Swiss-Prot record:
SUPFAM superfamilies: NusB-like. The gene is nusB. It comes from Saccharophagus degradans (strain 2-40 / ATCC 43961 / DSM 17024). GO terms for cellular component: cytosol. InterPro entries: NusB-like_sf, NusB_fam, NusB_RsmB_TIM44. It comes from the Bacteria. One of its GO terms (molecular function) is RNA binding. This is Transcription antitermination protein NusB.
Length: 150
């Protein structure tokens, strides 16, 4: 069964919030995940994708941080607001582990999350960093899109 783009978008929305909560609270992932299932209507959410992003990001958080750190223009990780950090980690996870998702979709979804939940203008920061990460991690796909060979 094909999952709708809206269900996948809601999964990203909840995953970002859960990652933020995990980072801020230090609670176990399974506890946070259970709370999301209890406190939210998950009937229109791609629950498998939510689970994958939440646990996938947590499993390789340090590796994901290293993916985008070179593009932070002098900022340290602890200088980035926690919402932006969750968005960047989630997007980098999708870049690296979900190559079935076009890089432009990953960036667009991340920018939308930053607009909705992030600090003022954080979406511009997210867009700039992810454009550079995409060129490094998905170079062939980005270049094909830019030259019209997609």
């Amino acid at each position: 069964m094909k999952v709708s783009a809206a269900a996948r978008g809601r999964a990203r929305h909840f995953a970002m919030q859960a990652l933020y909560q995990w980072e801020m609270s230090g609670n176990a992932l399974h506890v946070i995940e259970a709370e999301f299932h209890t406190d939210n209507d998950m009937s229109k959410v791609d629950v498998e994708y939510f689970h994958e992003i939440l646990h996938g990001v947590a499993a390789i958080k340090s590796t994901l941080d290293e993916t985008f750190k070179p593009f932070l223009t002098g900022l340290r990780l602890d200088e980035i607001d926690p919402v932006s950090l969750a968005v960047l980690r989630q997007a980098c996870y999708e870049f690296e582990k979900r190559v079935d998702v076009p890089y432009k979709v990953v960036i667009n979804e991340a920018v939308n999350l930053a607009k909705k939940f992030g600090a003022a203008d954080s979406h511009k920061f997210i867009n700039g960093v992810l454009d550079k990460v995409a060129l490094r991690v998905r170079k062939d796909e980005v270049e094909a899109m830019r030259t019209g060979r997609s």
